[in-house]
Amino acid sequence: HEPGSTFKLMSMVAALEDKVIKPSDLIDTGNGEILFFGKHKVRDSRKGGYGKISVSKVFEVSSNTGMVKIINDNYKNNPENFVDRLYNMRLHKILDIPIIGEARPKIPYPSDPDWDGLDLPWMAFGYGVSITPLQTLTFYNAIANNGVMIKPKFIHKIGRLGAKPHKTYKSEILNPSICSKETLNAVQEMMFNVVEKKWGTANNIKDEMFSIAGKTGTCQIDYTTNSIEYISSFVGYFPADKPKYSCIVLIHKPNKLKGYYGSIVAAPVFKQIAKKIYSAIPKEIPVNLKDLKSNSTNSLL
C-alpha cells in the first residue's frame, strides 16, 4: 500500500545525503497548500500552514507542503537523482523473507512510460509508491541500527530448552550503510523530536519512563472514489537513546468519527506495546558495595 507520511523519512534521508538541504534550512510552507497543474492540491493537516519553518520541523510536524518543496524544488530538473538515492538504499527490492507472498515494492522511475509531473512531488510524502509495513519497518530499524539494514529474522535458534542449540541462524546484512553518520544523527534527532517536542505529531505518547523515536503516518486510500478511507500508522523504536526494539502499527480504515490521524489512532497502540515490553525488561539497580556485609546474604533483583 501507499505508506503516506512514514515515507517522509526516506525522502528526508535522500535529501540530506545529497546535501540539497540542511536541517536548519528554512522552508516556506506558505498557507499550507500547493496547487499542481491547476487542480491537484497538496495540503497540510493544519489549516493555514506553518509559515517558514526549519527542515527539521517540516519532518517533526509532518508538513506535506514542506516535504514536497524540499524534494520537488531540488530534484524537479533531475528526478533520477532522487529515485537513484532511494534505490541505493535498497527500497525497490523485496526482503526475500521465508514467507510466501511478499509484495514487491513499487518505486516509480523517471524513465517509466507512465511517469508524469505529479510523481516526484507525490513520492515526497509517500504517495505513488507502494511498500509493505515490514519493508518500512526494516528501513526504520536500519536508522536505529546506525545505518545497518538487517534482513528480518523470524527464528534465531532451534534446540531443546536449556540445551545447546543444534542450529543457529545468523543475521544477514542487506545494506551495510544506508547513509552517512551525519544524516543518521540528523534524522534520529528529528524522530526523537516527533515524540519529545510539544509540536511533534506524536507528543501525545511521550513517556517519562523511556524515550520513543518515530514517525506518524496518515494515508488516504480509495481516494479516487467518493468514500475516502484511511490507513493510520506509527513506526519507530525505543528506547530512543539506546534502541533495542522497533515496531510498526497500522490501523486500516479507522472509525473516522473517532479519529483517523496516525497520532490519534496508531501511536497510542505503539506506546502500549512499548510499555508492555519495557516493563518486562529487568532493570539494573546500582548497589554500593560498602553497604554489603561479608557475612550476610543479599538478594538483588
Language-model features, listed with the residues they occupy:
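Short, gly/Ser/Thr-rich active-site loops of penicillin-recognizing serine hydrolases
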Residues: P165-I173, I264-L301
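Short beta-strands and strand-coil junctions in structured, solvent-facing domains, enriched
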Residues: K256-L257
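Beta-lactam-recognizing serine transpeptidase/beta-lactamase-like catalytic domain environment
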Residues: H1-S5, M10-K253, G262, T297-L301
